[in-house]
Amino acid sequence: MSLAKASLWTAASTLVKIGAGLLVGKLLAVSFGPAGLGLAANFRQLITVLGVLAGAGIFNGVTKYVAQYHDNPQQLRRVVGTSSAMVLGFSTLMALVFVLAAAPISQGLFGNTDYQGLVRLVALVQMGIAWGNLLLALMKGFRDAAGNALSLIVGSLIGVLAYYVSYRLGGYEGALLGLALIPALVVIPAAIMLIKRGVIPLSYLKPSWDNGLAGQLSKFTLMALITSVTLPVAYIMMRKLLAAQYSWDEVGIWQGVSSISDAYLQFITASFSVYLLPTLSRLTEKRDITREVVKSLKFVLPAVAAASFTVWLLRDFAIWLLLSNKFTAMRDLFAWQLVGDVLKVGAYVFGYLVIAKASLRFYILAEVSQFTLLMVFAHWLIPAHGALGAAQAYMATYIVYFSLCCGVFLLWRRRA
């Protein structure tokens, strides 16, 4: 399956995911205003981190090795069994941490300990996120874009219903819990789809252990841990800096443009893990890898640029439709944010090459570079320009980072 075909399949699921996310954002914005949306931003960041980290964060590794061993049943069984064991063990450990450390987690996210009950509920919900992500990773390894898309579509619809029920029953805390339920409930249709496809026997999912594979997958766990303490922490620190220098309303304004940005970018990036990761995992020759990377960039950069320009033209309509008139101040942030988006997605192509080759050294360097750049530009621009400065820091970070990625790739390509 080509990148374009994978993109078409994932576009349908992404459209539903975007619709779900924007509907949730609209409810939060209308019900709780910029301050409520701003305060929820750190919790949404936690959900994003759990999407990466829950279940040992091995999902890119699962996709890589399933793609690599898809025609070797004995090795494939080891991959799936070891992955199941790691997901079960790590998600259980995460649940214990959330239950026992509910107070400091609440303090770190919200600035008080009033949300301990919510944190303890998330301890259970993240187990659903972990298993759902494992099943999706298996389908991605087989490059089953259709199965992956259908699972996400049905899961998103179930999740929105669960969100609305939680919101009606629990108010603001219920709405926050609903944010976590949306990705967690994908596990239901994903399990049904995997059974229906029959690509692997269910017995393969029985937890087992292979030391060699566990060691290889642990590289991806370390990558996930690094991811969870770099960019998410950087964004939390940026929000706290913005709130301290200005207000939570300013945080909400920046979060508003970020949420719109995240939504439309899913159309482009959703196909990466379905097509790009397994494809790059199978390639071994530099010439073939270079051809695939260049082809992907030629597709991705114009697509994101066109989408970004469209969003910029429709920014006033987007604010009215997706948020409320309380967010009109964010119209000045779009140009800065959207330029950063184009270059960020371009850098993602190089990032997936690093993941496909399980290059831990380059992965750490990439994450630390982004964290450092964000912090440097944020501490310079946020005090001077508020929410606008946050968007400017984002753009400046990815101008520099994309340039670095291109330079490193050219050096790697020229090495013998």
UniProtKB/Swiss-Prot annotation:
Q: Give the GO cellular component terms, alphabetically.
A: plasma membrane
State any single GO MF term. Answer: intramembrane lipid transporter activity
User: Which membrane topology describes this protein?
Assistant: Multi-pass membrane protein
Which residues point to the Periplasmic side?
Answer: 39-45, 106-121, 166-174, 238-259, 324-334
Q: In which pathway does it act?
A: Bacterial outer membrane biogenesis; enterobacterial common antigen biosynthesis
Which keywords, in A-to-Z order, does the entry hold? Answer: Cell inner membrane, Cell membrane, Membrane, Transmembrane, Transmembrane helix, Transport
Say which domain of life the source belongs to.
Answer: Bacteria
> Could you tell me where this protein is found in the cell?
Cell inner membrane
**Upon deletion of the gene, what happens?**
Null mutation results in the accumulation of lipid III and cell death.
Q: Which family does it belong to?
A: Belongs to the polysaccharide transport (PST) (TC 2.A.66.2) family.
Under what name is this protein listed?
Answer: Lipid III flippase
Q: What is the lineage of its organism?
A: Bacteria, Pseudomonadati, Pseudomonadota, Gammaproteobacteria, Enterobacterales
